[in-house]
A protein has these predicted regions:
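Substrate-binding/active-site clefts of carbohydrate-active enzymes
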Residues: 100, 104, 114-303, 322-333, ...
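Edge beta-strands of extracellular beta-sandwich domains
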Residues: 80-86
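Active-site-proximal helices and loops of the catalytic beta/alpha 8
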Residues: 26, 213, 217, 289-292, ...
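Conserved structural position at the C-terminal beta-strand
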Residues: 72-74
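Surface-exposed, short loops/turns at beta-strand junctions within beta-sandwich domains
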Residues: 57-64
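Solvent-exposed loop/turn segments flanking beta-strands in beta-repeat/beta-sandwich domains
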Residues: 16-30
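Aromatic sugar-binding surface patches on proteins
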Residues: 46-54
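Short, solvent-exposed loop/linker segments at the N-terminal edge
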Residues: 1-7
Length: 458
């Protein structure tokens, strides 16, 4: 493997004692590939005496044969040693898509709000949306993204992150309250194997991928494994709304949801959305099958497909699921990368997600605050933090810096609509170590407040 790929470490245990109950822990020493000296392997994945986990290669590692020491600690505390081998190759790239994941320049767009390329798919279920309302569908689609590839190429973007593409529920989620709210954002899934009709057709998706790749731009798709949409677990107060999910719609998720939600991050129903029992191996495998299936499903006649996933609600799903998910992605394509939304993460708080077979990168929630400090005059303090941040970032310990997002107040609003401060912060963002993530419209000085009643989603 080269430094922009993941390898799958496979450990085969032998002997009658090679059972989970007889093992205290198993860990790898990844020092020889630029990783930590103790990376635990997840014993929940022990199956048929085998254990697998994805590993990354630091780009400072010299090409050649590398040894991976493995230690198995039995229930009595005794250590048993093993040794794995890995060949690290030099990365040779000649094409416009041969940049490393850590060289990405991401443009994040809420697809429905970007550009309407096909008005025929604006209202597939006859809901008669009021497009002046910020909580309904406005018509942006995949064809609209394709039409604007030249603009994004000129801007210098090499990766487009688009909101989830799976079919979402399409009913007024606030019908019973006399208000309006639809899942234009894509995070309330109805069917994980179908493309949402508001976005267009599979032909449109494949055309976007081919057109982007022809322009040296990769496609990152947002995926959710934590929850489905409202109305997909049981009938709710809004069941009188047009196009409310049917029993047939709900049947595909039978037995997959948590019946007795808890109060912790893993077991709670975030925002009241039906929570998947991802710690159940059957539920986990089904969700991973649905999401990774899009890599083959979206493959074009040219052989192009989705390049990366942005992973939603990482904090709300068990770590074993993320290891299985990453293992599957590595099997499909060693170069397929993920950037996770672990809410509140920064360079000093990755929630245990990086360098252990789970996420390849995390969105950096702490960055915008330090950028704001810098542009407001605390140059020395902010610079010290950013220098320390840069010293800790590598291609295997990677953060994506953003100033604004669909979940938080726009940066420009938080600095009093001062465009000079916005531009200075953007200069920091694009040149700092890590992956710059530009929120759509931000390059034009567009911004808004977060919050349901403020109406600045566009």
């Amino acid at each position: 493997v080269n430094y922009d790929e993941n390898a799958l470490a496979n450990l085969k245990l032998s002997g009658s004692d090679a059972k989970k109950e007889n093992i205290k822990e198993v860990y790898m020493d990844l020092t020889n590939v630029g990783g930590p000296n103790k990376v635990l392997m997840d014993l929940n994945l022990l199956k048929d005496n085998s254990l697998s986990q994805s590993i990354g290669i630091n780009d400072n590692v010299v090409a050649g044969e590398k040894e991976i020491p493995v230690t198995i600690v039995d229930k009595n505390g005794e250590n048993h040693k093993a040794l794995g081998n890995l060949t690290v190759k030099s990365k040779v790239g000649v094409g416009p898509l041969d940049f490393g994941f850590d060289e990405s320049r991401i443009y994040f767009t809420v697809t429905d709000r970007f550009f309407n390329g096909d008005k025929n798919n604006d209202d597939p279920h006859g809901n008669n949306y009021d497009k002046k309302n910020p909580y309904t569908y406005h018509g942006g689609d995949l064809k609209g993204l394709t039409d604007k590839i030249p603009y994004l190429k000129e801007l210098g973007i090499n990766t487009i992150w688009i909101t989830p593409i799976v079919e979402n529920t399409d009913f007024n989620q606030m019908f019973s309250q006399g208000k309006t709210q639809y899942s234009y954002h894509g995070y309330w899934a109805k069917d994980f194997e179908k493309l949402d009709p508001h976005l267009g057709t599979m032909y449109d998706l494949k055309t976007l991928i081919d057109t982007a790749h022809d322009s040296g731009i990769k496609i990152m798709v947002d995926v959710v494994l934590n929850h489905a949409g409202y109305g997909m677990k049981n009938k709710e107060a809004n069941s009188g709304a047009n196009n409310y999910p049917t029993e047939e719609d709900r049947a595909k998720f039978k037995g997959m949801f948590r019946e007795n939600p808890g109060n912790d991050f893993i077991t709670q129903e975030s925002a009241g959305l039906p929570d998947f029992k991802t710690e159940d191996p059957e539920v986990r495998e089904k969700l991973i099958e649905w999401q990774t299936g899009w890599i083959e499903r979206s493959k074009t006649e040219k052989g192009n497909t989705i390049d990366y996933f942005r992973v939603d609600t990482v904090k709300h799903v068990d770590n074993t699921t993320w290891k299985v998910f990453k293992n599957k992605l590595t099997e499909i394509n060693p170069s397929f990368k993920t950037i996770g939304e672990y809410f509140g993460a920064d360079i000093n708080n990755d929630g245990g997600q990086l360098q252990n077979g789970q996420m390849d990168a995390l969105l950096d929630f702490g960055y915008k605050g330090k950028a704001r400090e810098f542009v407001n005059g605390n140059i020395e303090g902010a610079s010290a933090y950013l220098d320390d941040r840069a010293s800790k970032i590598s291609n295997t310990n990677l953060m994506g810096q953003f100033l604004s997002s669909h979940d938080e107040d726009g940066f420009l609003k938080t600095v009093g609509d001062d465009l000079g401060k916005q531009m200075l912060a953007a200069s920091l963002q694009i040149t700092d170590k890590g992956i710059p993530v530009i929120y759509y419209g931000e390059e034009l000085g567009m911004s808004g407040w977060n919050g349901f009643e403020q109406g600045d989603q566009n």
